[in-house]
Regions:
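Bacterial Sec-dependent N-terminal signal peptides
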Residues: 1-23
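Glycoside hydrolase catalytic-domain context in secreted enzymes
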Residues: 16-535, 539-843, 850-868, 877-879
Length: 879
């Protein structure tokens, strides 16, 4: 009965409005898609055409076409709450496994389709939707703005965690698998749309992306910044490409004829949708941003004429005026609208459900145990063992006492990273919980010890308000301020011990509270438990008012970047005096601004300088100490970057204090980027890079720490020794950046990663030592490398092949061109077989403004990391 019910509902939900079925030729599935698109296009008014060229596409009620929101996210799982959360892409990249990435994103798209199947697409709310409505993502649809295939050129960039690292080849091959997994392998329909973003040359600094210009050399453009985009277009048939915020060669990317027409359309033959990042068109004319256009009309017309099909925003509404003034022809709009309409037909939005291959995917797929198992396995494969002195790891499960300390140990939100969804409650487990579950007979001493990046201990007092109930929070959805005149009843109230509200996540500010016209009042009585300065920190998108005993302590009118929002910046604390035993009535009032997102976060607390003396004495009874630290997506993400790459000072202090105990110290680093450990080198016995591992991270980490899984991950980025190794963040030249151009000595190299077992890499062979330039599908040569597991446990080793062009000063020092992951039992030998095709020998040719195979002498290097000591080589010639 259950199976029949799901399928029956699905058939109803996939169809367009019943009042419009079988009325028009565009609904006739016996016609070609091109014929159907042309028929639908012919029935639309100019205003309707414009309304369909924006992210929140209007409904065409007379034709039975519901509104559609093109914006959904699936960076490492469907972003909304209740879906499986996999490791961040930077962690998936560390697995060096094309199959793993494909399998993960096949599950992601399954969950997306299952959600689409259970959604009522004839809901009256989807009709009578005019132009200019709010376009924030709500219920996920079928078009997902992933993957991010920008090059992680600088470890300070906040969004590097969304990418597959610093190497163009690795980004390309894993990006291709992401797209194939998302879009499915059906010949007639796409399961979902993937989107290659942010096209192109986009990697921070985040605060400047709406106003900056980048002008890389043509060589860097073609050899570093474009290869992944080219691969997604030509090898994966990606159906959406997002143009980036910044200017490229003086023009906003969304008006760059070179990027969008010359390269994307003409050179690569791209035939699908180009869309903007959200509010990117506004940047063209907003004061203090690009200021390349005088107004929204000129910006919109220019964007469309130069290759942009769909806007995330509302500025394209002005295209109706452009039509009337003759600034743009309706036939031009038709050229662009054809692509977006074709996209909806290709997704099966206008076809009966029984025609679609995924109609049987029901809600049971979403956050299933099968998907949780995949998320856990992906997390295992993502972890990279960087140090293991004296084989401290794996830890014995028979240890009597283990100390677990550090700011990330018991933080469940940490696991999700940037652009992460929220797993179901049964899949929410902290890393600390995973350790406890793995060794139930072991005594665990736990202390948070410190905050991520703060040398002061914070004593929180929100829970002490209102006689221990916490602060009272009242929520309104009202166009009028509820703080002036007669106060309407709030839509929701509750007592809270934390202030952390935003329109991100499953419920927005709170369940039952709309994201529109939000107003919040926080209030309570506090009886002071000390005499001194009570600290507070507040940050919001639109300011706030703080009152104590009826007096305004601070009125923040908003504007500018919210303070205290992490991203490597120090939280700003202010204060008001308190006296022990006295009562203080505190009120905070906030209203949502007009920006893209809403946010109100804060705390009321004491601040004391940290001292680890007592902690060090306490953990001396432990047999081993596990520090779970690093950073979190609160310190790196969209909108903000890390200020530096050093391990935060307070954690340096913690590491040194734990090392002073004489006990084995294992440091588990959680981050989406490279962290410099030079300041504490030699102060830890083992170092494990865990990234942001998703909902399976707790079990995965425990499996690795206690030997149930042998780590085999490899770094997809370079771990530098200090900030001094980094060029200017604003400089988009690749000189001295990433392993391909870095002339210094890294702390941990790209491609590096240890195991609990040992491997011997034998002498490799090549099927050919030279090749002739010419058109051929055959590889130029195949590298065959024997690998033997010489240790005592099963493990994986990844053979990597790099190419170096000799006699070319501007070429990379070496560049990854192939890899193969081998799983070997003790004593077993297998061969890695890695083909090098013509693309492995392509470099920029200014005569054709494109990549081309270059004749000359090459070195083919193979081994287990990018370090010279781990590589052997062949000579190779291209004639």
């Amino acid at each position: 009965m259950k199976r029949f019910f799901c399928v029956a509902i699905t058939v109803a939900l996939f169809s367009v409005s019943a009042t419009a079925q079988e009325k028009f030729p565009w609904q006739d599935t016996s016609l070609s898609r091109t014929e159907r698109v042309e028929n639908l296009l012919s029935m639309l008014t100019p205003e309707e055409k414009v309304g369909l060229m924006m992210n929140k596409s209007i409904s065409i009620d007379r034709l039975g076409i519901p509104s559609y929101n093109w914006w959904s996210e699936a960076c490492h799982g469907v972003r909304q709450g209740g879906y499986t959360v996999y490791p961040q892409p930077i962690g998936l990249a560390a697995a060096f496994s094309e199959k793993l990435v494909y399998d993960v994103f096949s599950q992601v798209s399954d969950e997306a389709r299952a959600n689409w199947n259970r959604t009522d697409h004839n809901d009256p709310k989807l009709f009578n939707v005019p132009m200019g409505v709010t376009y924030y993502p709500g219920n996920p649809e079928l078009t997902f703005w992933c993957p991010n295939v920008n090059i992680f050129r600088d470890p300070r960039w906040g969004r590097g965690q969304e990418t597959c690292g610093e190497d163009p080849y690795l980004n390309a091959v894993l990006g291709v698998q992401t797209v194939l997994g998302m879009q499915g392998n059906n010949d007639k329909y796409f399961k979902t749309h993937a989107c290659a973003k942010h096209y192109a040359v986009h990697s921070g600094p985040e605060p400047l992306r709406h106003s900056m210009n980048v002008d890389p050399s043509n060589r860097d453009l073609w050899e570093t910044y474009l290869p992944a985009f080219k691969a997604l277009v030509k090898k994966a048939n990606v159906r959406e490409v997002m143009c980036a915020y910044q200017r490229f060669e003086g023009k906003p990317c969304c008006t760059s004829d070179r990027l969008l027409i010359d390269i994307l359309r003409n050179k690569w033959g791209y035939d699908a949708i180009v869309l903007t990042d959200c509010d990117a068109i506004n940047n063209f004319f907003n004061r203090g941003q690009h200021e390349t256009h005088k107004d929204g009309l000129s910006a919109s017309v220019d964007a469309v004429l130069n290759g942009t099909d769909l806007e995330c925003g509302k500025v394209f509404m002005s295209l109706t005026e452009g039509l009337k003034k003759g600034l743009i022809e309706e036939s031009v709009l038709d050229q662009h609208l054809r692509k977006t309409l074709m996209g909806r037909f290709e997704l099966g939005m206008f076809d009966p459900a029984e025609m679609l291959p995924w109609a049987n995917l029901g809600p049971e797929v979403i956050s299933s145990e099968k998907n949780n198992d995949m998320a856990t396995q992906a997390a295992r494969e993502s972890m990279v063992l960087l140090e293991n002195k004296g084989n401290v790891l794996p830890l014995s499960k028979s240890l009597k006492t283990i100390a677990v300390v550090g700011p990330n140990a018991d933080d469940i939100e940490l696991l999700n990273g940037n652009y992460g969804g929220t797993p179901t409650d049964n899949h929410k487990h902290s890393l600390l919980e995973g350790i406890k579950n793995a060794v139930p007979g072991t005594k665990i001493i736990y202390q948070k010890a410190c905050e991520l990046n703060d040398e002061y201990q914070t004593v929180h007092h929100l829970q002490d308000f209102n006689d221990g109930k916490g602060v009272l929070v009242e929520f309104w959805n009202s166009e009028q301020s509820p703080f002036e005149g007669e106060t309407p009843a709030p839509v929701k109230t509750g007592y809270y011990n934390e202030l952390n509200f935003s329109t991100f996540g499953a419920w927005g500010f709170a369940e039952g509270v709309s994201n529109d016209n939000i107003a919040v009042r926080i209030s309570g009585k506090y009886t002071a438990t000390f005499t001194g300065e009570m600290k507070y920190t507040l940050s919001s998108d639109n300011g706030y008012v703080l009152k104590v005993n009826g007096q305004v302590v601070e009125e923040n009118k908003g504007g500018g970047r919210p303070r205290g929002f992490g991203f490597g910046r120090r939280v700003e604390y202010k204060s008001f005096p308190v006296e022990q035993g006295k009562d203080y009535d505190v009120v905070i009032e906030y209203r949502r601004g007009k920006g893209q997102f809403a946010m109100l976060r804060g705390d009321i607390c004491e601040r004391k300088l940290v001292d680890f003396t007592d902690l060090a004495n306490e953990v001396k009874q432990a047999d081993a100490i596990i520090i779970i630290g690093g950073i979190s997506a609160r310190m790196e993400g969209e909108g903000g970057d890390k200020q530096d790459i050093e391990l935060p000072k307070v954690q340096q202090m913690l590491v040194k204090a734990m090392h002073s105990t004489g006990k084995p110290v294992v440091f588990v680093n959680c981050s989406g980027s490279a962290i410099a450990f030079g300041s504490v080198e030699g102060q830890y016995d083992a170092l494990l890079q865990a990234w942001y591992p998703g909902q399976g991270g707790a079990k995965a980490l425990a499996d690795v720490l206690f030997g149930d899984y042998c780590p085999g991950g490899k770094l997809p980025v370079t771990f530098y020794r200090s900030n001094n190794d980094l060029p200017d963040f604003l400089d988009y030249s690749m000189k001295n950046r990433t392993y391909r151009y870095f002339t210094g000595v890294p702390q941990y190299a790209f491609g590096y990663g240890l195991s609990y077992t040992t491997f011997s890499v034998g002498k490799g062979k090549m099927t050919a030592k030279s090749a002739k330039i010419g058109k051929s599908d055959k590889p130029y040569s195949v590298v065959v490398v024997p690998v033997t597991n010489t240790g005592k446990c099963e493990g994986t080793e990844t053979v990597q092949v790099y190419v170096k062009r000799l006699g070319d000063e501007g070429a990379p020092i070496k560049a990854l061109k192939g890899f193969q992951k081998l799983t070997l039992k003790p004593g077993e030998t297998k061969r890695a077989v890695i083909a090098l095709n013509s693309e492995a020998f392509e470099y920029y040719d200014d005569a054709i403004d494109e990549l081309a195979v270059k004749p000359g002498r090459y070195q083919i290097l193979y081994g287990t990391s990018s370090l010279d000591k781990d590589l052997q080589s062949f000579d190779f010639t291209v004639k």
